[in-house]
Design a protein with these regions (language model features):
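Transmembrane-embedded, aromatic-rich helix segments that form part
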Residues: 34-46, 80, 84, 158-164
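Conserved small/polar residues in nucleotide/adenosyl-binding loops
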Residues: 246-247
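Cytosolic-side transmembrane helix boundary signature
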Residues: 115-135, 155-193
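Transmembrane helix irregularities
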Residues: 24-31, 72, 150-154
Length: 247
């Protein structure tokens, strides 16, 4: 698919191939996480197509920068979005059930509705390109609702998330030679990619539906958002040391 994009990279609607790639990436997460290792190669193809460098030294530095960006994207998907959606959904569930006294699964429903509404609003703002402030606020809210910046657990995840969101805000405001480094088209494409990645990743809902039927084989019994988090963390497989000590 990235080679298909390369053939049409100069066309106005070439970004649709990137959006399709992210949808396939979301689906591949449900098959095996090693599929995410395709992302560095995809980023390199994108860089070489968009930023050809005649100077070999500049090309080397650009390739290293592209690899660093690909690692950041890989970490954002693997350690941010994949566990982050479940983590933020769990926070909503605890808030609505333990604090507000609502029935079970109320927080999850509210979270899903707010997540969809935030993504739609952010995509609309980046498409219309009328207010930079609203664009950036909607973009940050979308990233936060997807749980991408919240690495770790407890209050440490919240603090790390605040720092990451502040850094993203600075990047969104950064200008080079009087022009924004992150244009509205980049934000719009990024939001569409995150939305399609979420749609592909939602195939994990089948796990919860299957577990609710109580089949004979039901490891970790992921019937709610908290046990689903344990299931996604592969806690059902236990741990085994890489080096066994002889006794």
């Amino acid at each position: 698919l990235i080679l298909k994009w390369e053939d049409h990279a100069d066309e106005p609607h070439s970004d649709r191939w990137l959006v399709l790639i992210m949808y396939m990436t979301g689906l591949s997460i449900g098959v095996h996480l090693l599929n995410l290792l395709c992302l560095p190669a995809i980023v390199l193809v994108y860089y070489y197509r968009k930023c050809p460098q005649p100077d070999s030294r500049k090309d080397l530095y650009g390739s290293i920068a592209a690899l660093v960006i690909s690692v950041v994207i890989l970490g954002a998907v693997l350690y941010g979005l994949v566990p982050g959606i479940v983590r933020v959904g769990g926070w909503f569930e605890l808030l609505f059930v333990n604090v507000f006294g609502c029935p079970f699964n109320t927080g999850e429903i509210v979270y899903i509705i707010l997540l969809i509404a935030t993504l739609v609003w952010a995509i609309y703002e980046s498409y219309k390109d009328q207010s930079l402030k609203r664009q950036n606020i909607a973009f940050l809210l979308s990233v936060a609702m997807l749980g991408i910046p919240f690495f770790g657990y407890g209050w440490s995840a919240v603090l790390i998330g605040i720092v990451v969101l502040a850094l993203i805000w600075l990047v969104l405001q950064y200008k080079r030679q009087g022009k924004l480094l992150i244009t509205s088209r980049i934000k719009n494409t990024s939001l569409l990619c995150m939305m399609m990645l979420l749609i592909g990743y939602s195939s994990y809902a089948v796990i919860v539906i299957r577990s609710a039927a109580n089949p004979p084989m039901d490891q970790n019994s992921p019937e709610d958002i908290f046990t689903l988090g344990d299931y996604l963390a592969r806690d059902q497989y236990g741990q085994r040391p890489l080096r066994s000590e002889e006794r």
